Amino acid sequence: AAGAGPAKGSDPKMPNLSDIADVAEALGGKSVLVVEKRCVAVRNRHSSCRKCIEACVADAISVGDNNVKIDAEACVSCGACTVVCPTEALVPVEPADVELASAAAEATRALGGNLSVFACARKAARREGDPDKYVSVPCLARMEESLLLQLASHGVGDVVLVDGTCSTCKFGGTSEGVTA
């Protein structure tokens, strides 16, 4: 019955299947989750921050009228916008940071040392190496400092980023840091 509260013996803090289904539907294949209450441009209409728009090679992001919109059809899922957002208003969903860290730990173990290797999806698609020994990311622009620091805190001494010729990639110039 409506308003009856949680079922006997269930934890009211735990999400139920309905909650999980609602979240899955809201994400609906999106690679980036927008948390508008974190966005400085939403919180302050006079803010000039447009870092996400500048990073987006697909022109899929718009900021205005106190909201942030991502055109899911135009988005190429590179993740560059999530890395440049200073307030983490754009959260990577596919792949999530936890998934990347877990995959990096497995690949590092497979290499038998303290080296982590990340390859852009374009390079990984060429299948030139053992896929158990590197982590594939949509674009190297998705790599952020927090992930690298997390790897270092777990004993990873070296990180290798392998690109697939950024200048001819559909993600183009997502990050000067990648092509530098």
Show which residues each predicted segment covers.
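Short, basic, glycine/proline-bearing loop/turn elements
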Residues: 127-137
